[in-house]
Amino acid sequence: AVDASKVKVRFELNSIPRNMIPDIEGLTRVLECCVDMSKEESEDTITMVKDAYKNCSRMNFHVLSCTDFGTKGMAGPYDHPHPFYTYMNSKGSSPGDPSRAGSHGHGKDAPLANSAVRTIFASSTYRNDEGEMTHMAQGKCVLMSHYQDDVMHENVGRWGAFNMTPVTDLESH
């Protein structure tokens, strides 16, 4: 933390209209492909995929927002080993002070496991090396490998800028 005496953490449960979820139609199409692909999978997998697909048609989504203030946050730039990149892309990797507590890079999947559509969005506002306020936002879903338009896709999908990096111009999205 920048100043531990001034750190604030806020948790809010919000109801968000379906049309406010970035690329919800794209996620719905991917889940439909996963439903088709899951037919040969275990009952647990079939149930999880069908439930996620069904949940994508909701008119409103419950979204848990976790916000912290007065910390170093998930700063960039968007490359290894910086915190935002590591949180959204790395497995078993946790940059930072070696004395800090935590699950050493494995706990970051917990929000995905608790999402009805196995999807998270993360955003960060931080001061870059030049002292300017910088913003990043990116989405991530972990589903299953699937075919879409006769092309095999991996189990991890991302929402972001054209090349699947974080969106930095928040006004345009």
Identify the role of each PLM range:
Residues 1-5, 19, 153-156, 163-173:
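N-terminal assembly/transducer modules of large multi-domain enzymes
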